Swiss-Prot record:
The gene is moaA. Keywords: 4Fe-4S, GTP-binding, Iron, Iron-sulfur, Lyase, Metal-binding, Molybdenum cofactor biosynthesis, Nucleotide-binding, S-adenosyl-L-methionine. It comes from Rhodopseudomonas palustris (strain ATCC BAA-98 / CGA009). S-adenosyl-L-methionine binds at Y41, G81, S135, M205. Residues 19-239 form the Radical SAM core domain. GO terms for molecular function: 4 iron, 4 sulfur cluster binding; cyclic pyranopterin monophosphate synthase activity; GTP 3',8'-cyclase activity; GTP binding; metal ion binding; S-adenosyl-L-methionine binding. This is GTP 3',8-cyclase. The lineage of its organism: Bacteria, Pseudomonadati, Pseudomonadota, Alphaproteobacteria, Hyphomicrobiales.
Length: 344
């Protein structure tokens, strides 16, 4: 794809602000719902994916992202599914990198399972990507296979090595699963910090299909923090990225440890983000079923007037907060869509 025909964003007169005064300057875009893993907390093993014809083209994704950048988005994260499995996705990254060069965008990054990083890390760095988040829940090969169902741990570790060699900063995201990897968190933390990588722990979120097994995966991160505090000195850090994580410095390792706790302590008061699916649906809250179609106005006109108005309307309906709960009585999720569709 080429970016020559795409109008660059103009100067932003006023950033996007939701009804509660929160500035929206962070966009997460799922460029595919497909993935080469089948993580137990993310999707079904026999997952039915969207027909490829339903997905926005790479050119449409570029135009959509650029429209948000023109309206004040400063940070753009590409997600999935697994973003690196989408064919020709690097052409999208290279095209979007023009906004880094003009200064319209501060950061272009992505979240990945790491399986394709060895192949793409150098090119990502060449496009101006400076850091990536890698989803990795365990360093035990057998447990890794149980969690991901299809994954190869050595391939992910090779991808992380390639990313670091290419000069990319790497942060590890780990979903803590009761009876699975909860006892491995200290060793995972020491490994990550030993390589100069941050680690962020995430509570299981009630999205998609949840049965008894899924419900029983949940463990509150307050418990994990208490366990860590018995052997490590955790010092709260005042700095925040404006996102959901709350950080501590682990004095014994010198590394940073984050906690994302949507069930036990939500992060809504400082929410600065919206999510777009690979079909052009905008979700202004991860924990609500709210949705607005941006594909229709995107395709209705060659200019962005209709699209811009639709974005404004969606931002204007962003809720104050979510109500994530795990409904044990009815085995119902708070949100019916899978994380792989919403974008992790």
């Amino acid at each position: 794809m080429t970016s020559a025909a795409i109008t660059p964003p103009t100067t932003v007169d006023r950033p996007m602000t939701d009804p509660f005064g929160r500035t929206i300057d962070y966009l997460r875009v799922s460029i595919t719902d497909r993935c080469d893993f089948r993580c137990v907390y993310c999707m079904a093993e026999d997952m039915t994916f969207l027909p490829r014809a339903d997905l926005l083209t790479l050119e449409e994704l570029d135009r959509l992202c650029s429209a948000f950048i023109a309206k004040g988005v400063r940070k753009l994260r590409l997600t999935g599914g697994e973003p690196l499995v989408r064919r020709n996705m690097m052409s999208l990254v290279r095209s979007l990198s023009r906004h880094l060069k003009t200064g319209a965008l501060d950061e272009l990054t992505l979240t990945t399972n790491g399986s394709q990083l060895a192949r793409f890390a150098a090119e990502l760095a060449d496009c101006g990507v400076r850091r990536v988040n890698v989803s990795l829940d365990t360093l035990d090969p057998d447990e890794f296979r149980r969690i991901t169902r299809w994954g190869d741990l050595e391939r992910v570790l090779a991808g992380i090595d390639a990313a670091r060699t290419a000069g990319l900063a790497v942060k590890i995201n780990s979903v803590v699963l009761k009876g699975s990897n909860e006892d491995e968190i200290p060793s995972l933390m020491r490994w990550a910090h030993g390589l100069g990588m941050g680690l962020t722990l995430i509570e299981v979120m009630p999205l998609g299909e949840i049965g008894e097994g899924r419900i029983d995966q949940y463990v509150p991160l307050s418990l994990i923090r208490a366990r860590l505090s018995a052997n490590y000195t955790l010092t709260d850090l005042p700095d925040s990225t404006g996102g959901p994580a709350r950080y501590v410095r682990v004095e014994e390792t010198g590394g940073r440890l984050g906690f994302i706790t949507p069930l036990t302590h939500n992060f809504c008061e400082s929410c600065n983000r919206v999510r777009i699916t690979c079909t052009g649906t905008i979700h202004t809250c991860l924990g609500h079923e709210d949705a607005s179609d941006l594909r229709r106005p995107l395709r209705a006109s060659p200019d962005d007037a209709l699209l811009s108005a639709a974005i404004d309307q969606a931002i204007g309906s962003k809720p104050k907060g979510h109500d994530f709960i795990i409904d044990r009585r009815h085995n119902r999720p708070s949100v019916s869509r899978h994380m792989s569709v919403t974008g992790g």
